[in-house]
C-alpha cells in the first residue's frame, strides 16, 4: 500500500449515507438549494446500497388521495392504533401528505408500476401497499442523486461527525476513510444531513408471529449510525 493521504472537501450541504434516504435528501437539497455545493458520501456504492439495494416488489405506503382511497388522517389513525398510541401524529401526517407526490415522481422517473387493467390505478396489495417491478428502484433514485450532487463519494466509511467549533451542539462536518485505499477524508460543511441507516430489532413486536416476519431485516439496520 502506498502512502496514505488526507483529502479535504468543503461544501454547503453534506449528506452522510447514500441509501434511499440519502439519495433522496441529495435530490431535495438541490431542488431547494440551486446554488449550493452538495456532497453525498456513501460507504458502498449508491447504485446498490442501503435497504433497497436489492430492489423491492412493493411501495409500502401510498395514500391514493387522487382517487379518494385514503387520506393522511387515515394513516395517522392506523399508525396510532398499531403502536398503541406511542406515535408522533404530526410527523406521521406530514409523511402521509407528501408520499403520493413522491411516488408519482418515481413513476415519472421510470419506475415500473403495476396497474389495475380496468381502472388504471396503481395495483394494491392490502390497504396501503402498491405493487411495483422494483429491481431498478435504487438505481433510478441514485441517478437522480448523481445529477443533483456536485460530488458523490463512494466507498467512504464515515467514522465520526465533527462538531462546529464556533457554535455549540452543532455538527460541522464528518471524517472517514476510503475502504479501498485507506485514504482519510475530512468533510467540512455548513449543514450536515445524517441518513446513515434505519433501525430495527430494537424492541419485541407485539403481534404473534411478527418476529418471524421481521427476520429478513439485516443486522446493519440496528440504529447505530449516529442516531
Which residues make up each language-model segment?
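Short, well-ordered coil/turn residues at beta-beta hairpins
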Residues: 17, 195-196
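Conserved N-terminal/central alpha/beta ligand/cofactor-binding core
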Residues: 4-5, 36-37, 42-172, 178, ...
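N-terminal/domain-start segments enriched in small and hydrophobic, helix-friendly residues
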Residues: 2-18
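Core beta-strand elements of the Rossmann-like FAD/NAD(P) dinucleotide-binding domain
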Residues: 8-11, 181-191
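A conserved FAD-binding loop/helix module that cradles the flavin
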Residues: 205-226
Amino acid at each position: 500500500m502506498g502512502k496514505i493521504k488526507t483529502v479535504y472537501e468543503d461544501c454547503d450541504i453534506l449528506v452522510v449515507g447514500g441509501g434511499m434516504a440519502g439519495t433522496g435528501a441529495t435530490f431535495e437539497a438541490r431542488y431547494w438549494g440551486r446554488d449550493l455545493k452538495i456532497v453525498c458520501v456513501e460507504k458502498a456504492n449508491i447504485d446498490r446500497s442501503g435497504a433497497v439495494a436489492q430492489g423491492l416488489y412493493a411501495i409500502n405506503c401510498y395514500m391514493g388521495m387522487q382517487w379518494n382511497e385514503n387520506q393522511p388522517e387515515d394513516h395517522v389513525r392506523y399508525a396510532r392504533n398499531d403502536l398503541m398510541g406511542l406515535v408522533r401524529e404530526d410527523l406521521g401526517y406530514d409523511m402521509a401528505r407528501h408520499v403520493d407526490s413522491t411516488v408519482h415522481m418515481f413513476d415519472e422517473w421510470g419506475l415500473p408500476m403495476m396497474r389495475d387493467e380496468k381502472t388504471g390505478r396503481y395495483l394494491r396489495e392490502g390497504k396501503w401497499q402498491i405493487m411495483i417491478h422494483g429491481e431498478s428502484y435504487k438505481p433510478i433514485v441514485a441517478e437522480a442523486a448523481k445529477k443533483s450532487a456536485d460530488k458523490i463519494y463512494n466507498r467512504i466509511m464515515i467514522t465520526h461527525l465533527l462538531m462546529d467549533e464556533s457554535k455549540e451542539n452543532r455538527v460541522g462536518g464528518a471524517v472517514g476513510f476510503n475502504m479501498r485505499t485507506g485514504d482519510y477524508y475530512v468533510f467540512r460543511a455548513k449543514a450536515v444531513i445524517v441518513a446513515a441507516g434505519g433501525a430495527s430489532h430494537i424492541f419485541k413486536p407485539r403481534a404473534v408471529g411478527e418476529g418471524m416476519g421481521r427476520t429478513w431485516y439485516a443486522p446493519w439496520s440496528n440504529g447505530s449510525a449516529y442516531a
